[in-house]
């Protein structure tokens, strides 16, 4: 939940201090990181997903994109890869599987005028920043959850929607459910540590890269893993409450019902978009998006900016190139919050020797 209370910074030793926190590591967030570096701002990025790229990576990595200036055409994932390469010289930290939960004003250390912001994530990470730039696309992505009555009590222990630590699956019987790139990639990776991996999908075809599908079929043929066509029917457990453990998974298909012995279920059915906690940050919103001033792309709450699809204003165009423009202007205003006593010198990558050296010899 959000708060309007001005507060002293607790547990400073456990808090990351930087100039700007970028919420969202999709194309706009990645370009924003590059722009921050060009301006001399320190920044860190967080994303609710387990890797950079946002919708381009998670929903349509193979989709052709034709409206990026000077790029006649490229695949969505190729664009993400190029943006990662572009911002790599600045080596800004990226924190994945992190959802921005709350923001609070922090008492300034010195001048008593330019207050800073404390952002806390769902895992407890905290960031003490001069400004926040929200580049969260259509909102925070949340996993499509298993709709079986037994699932909620097992989530986080035996039912998972992301793989955050491969070692926890060592020696386990793992069922990976899904038919996209993430499901195939993790099934293939987990087969190297798990006692047995079964990939479960409702049909023979996949929405995944041909190479991954071929590798999976070869692994099945070699006896390294299993592939079952069907849908989740029930989760059978032992124990109760927090001591409940997954024992078996009931699979339903046209051929009937079968039961798989399983210790862990990794359900990778894709993502759904939701506004998330950001909608409760006491900013003016329009249809789930952040209303911004188009001269600075700052929200109604001082120090919080928005760029990309999450930003709302009259005649807003939901284009990646629009997000690039919005982020560039937002960071110029954010610079004044980070360095209130300094004037921003207009920087061009072509005529700044130090910057040019950094970008060409990274």
Swiss-Prot record:
Coiled-coil boundaries: none
EC code: 1.18.1.2
Keywords: FAD, Flavoprotein, NADP, Oxidoreductase
Annotated SUPFAM superfamilies: FAD/NAD(P)-binding domain
Pfam families named in the record: Pyr_redox_2 (PF07992)
Cofactor mode of binding and number, as noted: Binds 1 FAD per subunit.
Cofactor: FAD
Oxidoreductase is among the record's keywords: yes
Annotated positions binding FAD: 47, 55, 60, 100, 141, 309, 350
Gene3D superfamilies documented for this protein: FAD/NAD(P)-binding domain
Main enzyme class: oxidoreductase
Catalytic activity, as annotated: 2 reduced [2Fe-2S]-[ferredoxin] + NADP(+) + H(+) = 2 oxidized [2Fe-2S]-[ferredoxin] + NADPH
One Gene Ontology MF term: ferredoxin-NADP+ reductase activity
InterPro entries: FAD/NAD-bd_sf, FAD/NAD-binding_dom, Fd--NADP_Rdtase_type_2, Ferredoxin-NADP_redctase_2
Subunit structure: Homodimer.
Assigned protein family: Belongs to the ferredoxin--NADP reductase type 2 family.
UniProt-listed PANTHER family: THIOREDOXIN REDUCTASE 1-RELATED-RELATED
Name recorded for this polypeptide: Ferredoxin--NADP reductase 1
């Amino acid at each position: 939940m959000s708060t309007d209370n001005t507060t002293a910074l607790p547990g400073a030793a456990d808090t990351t201090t930087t100039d700007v926190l970028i919420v969202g590591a999709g194309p706009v967030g990645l370009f924003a990181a590059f722009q921050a570096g060009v301006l001399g701002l320190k920044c860190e990025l967080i994303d609710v997903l387990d890797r950079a790229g946002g919708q381009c990576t998670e929903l349509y990595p193979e989709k052709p994109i034709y409206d990026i200036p000077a790029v006649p055409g490229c695949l969505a994932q190729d664009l993400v890869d190029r943006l990662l390469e572009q911002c790599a010289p600045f080596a800004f930290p990226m924190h994945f599987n992190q959802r921005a939960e709350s923001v609070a004003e922090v008492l300034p250390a010195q001048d008593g005028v330019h207050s800073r912001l404390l952002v806390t994530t769902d895992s407890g990470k905290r960031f003490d920043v001069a400004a926040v730039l929200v580049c969260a696309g259509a909102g925070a992505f949340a996993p499509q959850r298993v709709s079986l009555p037994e699932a909620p009590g097992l989530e986080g222990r035996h039912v998972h929607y992301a793989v955050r630590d491969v070692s926890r699956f060592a020696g386990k019987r793992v069922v990976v459910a899904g038919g996209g790139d993430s499901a195939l990639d993790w099934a293939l990776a987990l087969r190297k540590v798990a006692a047995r991996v079964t990939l479960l999908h409702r049909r023979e075809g996949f929405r995944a890269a041909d190479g991954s599908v071929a590798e999976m079929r070869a692994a099945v043929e070699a006896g390294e893993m299993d592939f079952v066509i069907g849908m989740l029917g029930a989760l059978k457990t032992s124990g109760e409450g927090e001591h409940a453990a997954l024992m078996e998974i009931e699979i339903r298909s046209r051929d009937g019902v079968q039961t798989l012995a399983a210790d862990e279920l990794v359900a990778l059915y894709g993502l759904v978009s939701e506004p998330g906690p950001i909608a409760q940050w006491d900013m003016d919103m329009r249809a789930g998006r952040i209303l911004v001033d188009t001269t600075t792309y700052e929200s109604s709450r001082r120090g919080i900016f928005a760029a990309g699809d999450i930003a709302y204003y009259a005649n807003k165009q939901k284009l990646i190139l629009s997000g690039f423009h919005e982020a560039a202007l937002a960071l110029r205003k954010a610079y004044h919050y980070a360095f209130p006593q300094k004037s921003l010198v207009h920087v061009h990558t072509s005529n700044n020797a130090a910057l040019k050296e950094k970008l060409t010899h990274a």
